[in-house]
């Protein structure tokens, strides 16, 4: 069996991964707060840990991996979005507006992540469906002396957990000195964090032993992971921005509520995403949602995925238009090579070894280039699948890669039905090439050059051979530019 080695944030070492139960490998990844469309940075952990999910499924079997990624659908940002709609005149109740907003945002999220080629997790729990489990966990923490109630709030007593700060490498006193915490008069200690907070009549709330209220952010993941994965599970992952305070707080409350377990054995964090070397910011004009890139800029989801995997997850990733263009051209070539080809029975050993070495996706992609250079379409397709690439779903390609010759032979990436509508382009291109041939035979070189310029300008690649002209559609092919030559 392939040995997987992963960098464990908790130990700060790359370690051989040994699951608690090889028959049920368990993975938890923190999901989105569903108040708006997912931005490009939100896509990075989804794609990175989708590769981990695929790798675990390959090594241990698809039926032996459980992957949980939650939706936070109770949050002040969600409330604010619903209140803004209400203020704008929407007649629905705030509760109805919140549900409509979260349902809509989850649908958007699924559309975007499906386009990026991410497999759906085994479970996608919504926080609001697990309020009872959260209340029960908070009650356990209070009973064990790790939490207390003040003014309708329930707070976790941070100094009751002696290992607090171990994940992020911070001491409690240093954290206080750094003023990275919310100080409230009802706290025993500035570091104590909220498990439960009161709700007024206008805000979402649930009845509890401490009055009507709603959960704090951190307790959600602890309760849902316990209910779906148990007190101990294999891997907990997420973005580096969640390491503190979210993941630190998860560890504290989970280990104190369930001391019989160890919570997560391995912690993994992907680094941040930049755009053109800078942090994404609306004021800088470099803030993109995945929907923006897909729909407004016409970048296929598979291309976005390829760019995200081009940098190791442990390093900051810089998105640029040049990288996207390069990835698009590469995938276009690979899709033509794998058109209507059945994948090999097994992926390439070097690709698998690269991914098993702490998800080294750049090394895996380098190896895919070598396989493509050998024109082994079957092996390329099987190996790329481990990275979620070159699958039959075309995922946003506006036109499938097509090649042709004077005989009208065509090749298509993906399913055969993807060719629908492109026959007209073949007929137009071959008619123009025939007109070009006739013009050259009649020594009307001005017209033959004009036809060639028209085709090239539309993104058609022409190669003249002794047997006649061969053509190919480039990645920038635009049928709208196939007019009549001047």
From Swiss-Prot:
Binding annotation for ATP: 282
Keyword Chaperone listed: no
Cofactor binding note from Swiss-Prot or TrEMBL: Binds 1 zinc ion per subunit.
First-listed, main subcellular location of the protein, grouped into a coarse class: cytoplasm
Cofactor(s) required for function per UniProt: Zn(2+)
Binding site for Zn(2+): 30, 221, 246, 250
Keywords: Aminoacyl-tRNA synthetase, ATP-binding, Cytoplasm, Ligase, Metal-binding, Nucleotide-binding, Protein biosynthesis, Zinc
Name of this chain's protein: Cysteine--tRNA ligase
Species of provenance: Cereibacter sphaeroides (strain ATCC 17025 / ATH 2.4.3) (Rhodobacter sphaeroides)
